[in-house]
Amino acid sequence: MAGLSSLPSRVVVLMGGPSAEREVSLSTGRGCAEALRGEGFDVIEVDPGVTHAGAELCARLQEIQPDVVFNALHGRWGEDGCVQGLLEWMRLPYTHSGVLSSALAMDKTRAKTALKAHGLPVVDSIIAPKEAVVAAHVMATPYVVKPNNEGSSVGVYLVNEAANGPPHLSDDMPDEVMVETYAPGRELTVSVLGDAPGDPGALTVTDILTDGWYDYDAKYKPGGSRHVVPAQIPQEIWDACMDMAVRAHTILGCKGVSRTDYRWDEARGLDGLIILEVNTQPGMTPTSLTPEQGEAVGMSFGKLCRWLVEDATCDR
């Protein structure tokens, strides 16, 4: 961990931005900014806006001269290596993962390929033209259709056995989409902090309970889902979740914090545990999983945000 030379330090919290996950990012950013102020940091909130205004952001950061940039952006531009490259070019220390790992994890197909090459179980999927997906079933139901490079369950469609035809996708879905086999079972997740000896590592396992599909509302609206922390699961499954999360974090080259999401089909035991995806910018809203896991292991939300700031470096 790269500690800061003096406190309080000036921290810019990047939030909002141009992606479909703008509202989630604004919620994350406000919460993190408040927590960091409570930890004694001089915090300035900066929203790059919705127009990919890189030049304007550079000018604003040059004006502020922050010691650290806390990246609370989600989705395209903020989570895919773009803003990370800009910050490295400006030689500004920043939180979370770097250019390569952010780009790799954001591209779900390539991330799965990397994880699978290292022996980790992932959900089978294909990339298909949007026009083909809306014209006919491209795989046996049930299956899931989603953008290859968005998160927070934005633009995710579940096509089940009862569907009479292919899904009707919204106009803002990309020309190519990911279609993946639906993985049944319980939704489990593990957050990982750091990548060096002495760092917290894997925190704990959460079991996410919902009354139906774990969609955007279930993730972010109060009462949309119930979280059991720590998860009440067999030790073998617990150990596998913790181990695979650290391995996935390492394989993709993640820095700071990541969160690995799973499905577990209880009837199949260990063979039923499969990775859905790895998030390099996990949500930090009041209902988010990573802050909740931190609290469960004795790390307050403020201390979690502080840890990320003190972990910030210029070359991630």
Swiss-Prot record:
Similarity field: Belongs to the D-alanine--D-alanine ligase family.
Keywords attached to this entry: ATP-binding, Cell shape, Cell wall biogenesis/degradation, Cytoplasm, Ligase, Magnesium, Manganese, Metal-binding, Nucleotide-binding, Peptidoglycan synthesis
Name of the protein this chain belongs to: D-alanine--D-alanine ligase
Free-text remark on how the cofactor is bound: Binds 2 magnesium or manganese ions per subunit.
Lineage per the UniProt record: Bacteria, Pseudomonadati, Pseudomonadota, Alphaproteobacteria, Rhodobacterales
Coiled coil regions, renumbered to chain: none
Pathway(s) it belongs to: Cell wall biogenesis; peptidoglycan biosynthesis
Chain positions recorded as ATP binding sites: 139-189
Cofactor(s) it depends on: Mg(2+); Mn(2+)
Record: residues binding Mg(2+) 1: 261, 277
Gene Ontology BP annotations: cell wall organization; peptidoglycan biosynthetic process; regulation of cell shape
HAMAP family, alphabetized: Dala_Dala_lig (MF_00047)
Keyword Metal-binding: yes
Location of the ATP-grasp domain: 112-310
The organism of origin for this protein: Jannaschia sp. (strain CCS1)
GO cellular component: cytoplasm
Reactions the enzyme catalyzes: 2 D-alanine + ATP = D-alanyl-D-alanine + ADP + phosphate + H(+)
GO molecular function, one term: metal ion binding
EC number: 6.3.2.4
